[in-house]
């Protein structure tokens, strides 16, 4: 009745699935995701990776719900997602993110998503695990985010996602402006501002970097 993503190098706590299923039922949701506990194998330290900022109206247009390894979803959304994926061409996507894709799919089709403030997974960080390192506000984070913005990571994803939106929707118009010229892109970012990302600090970095991208 339920499907969960799993990364082979992470550790699930015993209550992970039971807690996810309880919260899916309690909140009448179709997709569950959660905070994570970062496990830095270089020094053995643990720290929280917060993802449960309040959901915003358009956050799914520019980010995922959490790391995909926290996702648990119902058979209903799984069947629709399967049909969607069969037709999906990712050959021209740069740094394709299944975390973002599933969240985009769920929210754009009005499935309810619940983001749990608890963590039931030890999310292993290592050299190959790029995204895990990018959630801490640091100089390395800013450098990596700068590279994403300046090299067109977001434009590339938006160009692919826009084709799955209703052309009369506000979401489509946001994407259309984002793909426009410098002034159109930055106008739409500042018009909707923190409605585009859940974490206000993350949004500010995103917005400022777009001002620097000509």
Model-found features: residue ranges?
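C-terminal subregions of glycosyltransferases and related glycan-biosynthesis enzymes
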Residues: 90-91, 108, 122-214
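Nucleotide-sugar donor-binding/catalytic module of glycosyltransferases
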Residues: 1-136
